[in-house]
Structure formats: C-alpha cells, structure tokens
Amino acid sequence: NLETHGQKSNAVLVPREAKSFIVDQVYDYPHVVKKSTRVVQPTFDIIVLGYKEPDLQENYEAIKSKHHTAKLVSGIEGNVNAYKECARQSHTEYFWCVFAKSKLEHGFSFNYHPDCLERPHHYIFKCYNPMIDYAYGHMGIILYHRQMVLDAKEWGPDFTCSFPVKLVDQISNTANYFH
C-alpha cells in the first residue's frame, strides 16, 4: 500500500512497485491508503505582481503588513515574463500571485494546499468584480505551480489556462478595474 499522511497528503510513503503504475498522478496507483496523521503544512511564497498601478505600493504594503514575507515584482514587460519572474523569485513548490490592482478579501488566509497525490495544477481563486456584482476567476489570486511556470515554452491566449487548472470556490480579492 501507498500511505499518505496529512490533510492534503503532503507526506507519502511509496512502495517501489508503485513507480510502474503512476503515469500522471499518484492516484493512478490502485492501493492508496490515507492516514489521518497530523503533518505540518508547508507555506508558499506570496508575490504581489504589478506593472504601473497607481495604488501598487499601497496594496503591497497592506498585504505585507499581514504576511511579512510577501515579495513585490513590478515593472516587467509582458504577462508571461512577469509570471516567470515571480516563479524565479519564489523558493517554494507553489507561489501565490496577487495582482496589485486588487484588494485582498478580508479573511483570505493563503492557507489552501493542493492535494499532493494529484498532478500539479494552477489554482485560480475567485475575484469579486464590483462593476457587475459577481465573483469569478478573472483577476483572482492564483496559486501557481512554480516549476510549471518556469518550464513553460508554449501557451495559448491565456497563459494560466494553457496548463492544468482548478477553480477554487473562494473569493480571494476585489478587483479595481478603474486603474
């Protein structure tokens, strides 16, 4: 049996024979046993990404006041170049990308953890759009898989959605479309 420990299976004991079964994700192996052992969840880097937003510094400082290790990446030409720079600045398996022209939702805690048995995904959180009174993925905080961003050579019109993604049904921020 392959044994997992922790709420999101972030500690795994894998038998040697499992290698021949796993193609895409650990769930390919037919004998997975989830244990309820408490395991400390890793934290992921938080990176505020901006370009020339007038309130970039203010929004960054608001996040940094609550999350002291948050980093700022700004002034990079082109979205993909900016995402790749965020990935280079990160030292964790995943990193949170917060768009500087949005305000963090009160109570959003950056504590989501991917299921470690699944293949890597980017995780898109909902963003509230006050212009239409609706929350959806556009401009939401994204939990990027660092290596997937660094390794990207080809992508479609939307960089993030060119790779495996999951939408997380949680409002992370409010967009400011007026900047």
Residue spans of the language-model regions?
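Catalytic-site signature of metal-activated, phosphate-bearing donor transferases
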Residues: 2-38, 111-179
